[in-house]
């Protein structure tokens, strides 16, 4: 799959919650190639600070309009700069990068938390309206603004929060074992905090259900050259940016 280095124009941004924004950019070559699970590397300004590009999972694509969507949390210098860009501003983007999800599941369950719900949104879109169920967890109701983004895509939405402010109190593991037992799912797709992914992968192993994980690592180059994202796989070192970011759970040796 080809990779494009493109100067793209910002279509617009919108606020999702106090620390999270959604941005749409006009990137027709990337939109034509991207598949669920891939990411792009973004340089947010023309000068040298911040020097390195930042990886963002593709959260959606509109091939007809030639646009891609990214969702990000405002937590560092690069994302603070990104939060201030306006319609018509330009960004430098490399992508699409990495390998995407296996799309052969007949009854998929998506499990996510935090920004891990961004690439899963594109996956739900890829399976088509009403063909996925989603289990999402957060610390509080404020973090689960994602329900509005998924409600037109997923058939069933299951919620958990640490404080019990919405859905079931606890983590996604409060609901997952029962869903695996009764839901008839043939594959689980998970992205989010490492402890959550590890717990989900182990639960799927015990239940005999296939599981794919989308790993989140710092990626300086996004091409497998710098090794900043390398980690232990089963029997070999894996480069998250090049070999992944999506892996079958049994391929991951280091969580």
Residue ranges of model-derived segments:
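Short, surface-exposed secondary-structure boundary micro-motifs
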Residues: 45-47, 96, 234
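Short, Lys/Arg- and Gly-enriched loop/turn segments at beta-strand edges
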Residues: 47-57, 98-106, 241
């Amino acid at each position: 799959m080809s990779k494009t280095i493109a100067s793209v124009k910002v279509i617009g941004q919108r606020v999702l919650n106090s620390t999270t924004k959604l941005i749409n950019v006009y990137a027709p070559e990337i939109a034509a190639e991207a598949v669920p699970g891939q990411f792009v590397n973004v340089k947010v300004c023309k000068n040298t600070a911040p020097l390195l590009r930042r990886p963002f999972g593709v959260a959606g694509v509109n091939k007809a309009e030639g646009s891609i969507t990214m969702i990000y949390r405002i937590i560092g210098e690069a994302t603070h700069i990104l939060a201030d860009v306006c319609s018509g501003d330009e960004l430098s983007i490399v992508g699409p990068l990495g390998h995407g999800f296996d799309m052969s599941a007949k009854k998929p369950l998506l499990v996510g938390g935090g920004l891990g719900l961004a690439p899963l949104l594109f996956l739900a879109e890829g399976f088509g309206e009403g063909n996925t169920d989603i289990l999402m967890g957060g610390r509080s109701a404020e973090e689960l603004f994602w329900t509005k983004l998924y409600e037109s895509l997923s058939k069933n939405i299951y919620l958990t929060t640490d404080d019990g402010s919405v859905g079931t109190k606890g983590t996604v593991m409060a609901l997952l074992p029962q869903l695996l037992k009764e839901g008839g799912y043939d594959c689980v797709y998970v992205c989010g905090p490492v402890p959550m992914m590890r717990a989900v992968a182990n639960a799927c192993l015990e239940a005999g259900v296939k599981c794919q994980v989308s790993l989140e690592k710092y990626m300086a180059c996004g091409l497998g050259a710098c090794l900043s994202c390398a980690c232990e796989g089963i029997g070999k070192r894996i480069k998250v940016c090049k070999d992944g970011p999506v892996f079958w759970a049994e391929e991951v040796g280091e969580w």
